[in-house]
């Protein structure tokens, strides 16, 4: 499985595997970058969502694996 080299490579809606479960990327916060609502995160983190609408936060983008069938 492929991994991301940078948090800038992560796209909304990307199909990823995290802790042996499949998710879609819902939100990708990048340290120091301000979003449209004025929020500036102090660390990188990615919010993932599964098919049952459960959300999970990934604090280390290197643990995300790009699902091959979606690539």
Where are the language model's segments positioned?
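Short, exposed beta-strand/loop patches in secreted or surface proteins that constitute
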Residues: 38-39, 56
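Mixed-charge, Lys/Arg-rich low-complexity intrinsically disordered regions
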Residues: 1-15
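Intrinsically disordered, low-complexity, charged/polar segments
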Residues: 44-71
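A short, compositionally biased
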Residues: 9-12, 40-44
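Short beta-strand-centered aromatic/proline hotspots
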Residues: 21-36
């Amino acid at each position: 499985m492929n991994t991301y080299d940078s948090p800038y490579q992560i796209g909304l809606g990307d199909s990823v595997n995290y802790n042996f479960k499949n998710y879609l990327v819902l939100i990708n916060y990048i340290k120091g970058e301000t979003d449209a609502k004025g929020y500036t995160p102090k660390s990188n983190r990615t919010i993932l969502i599964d098919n049952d609408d459960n959300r999970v936060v990934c604090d280390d983008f290197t643990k995300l694996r790009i699902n091959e069938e979606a690539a």
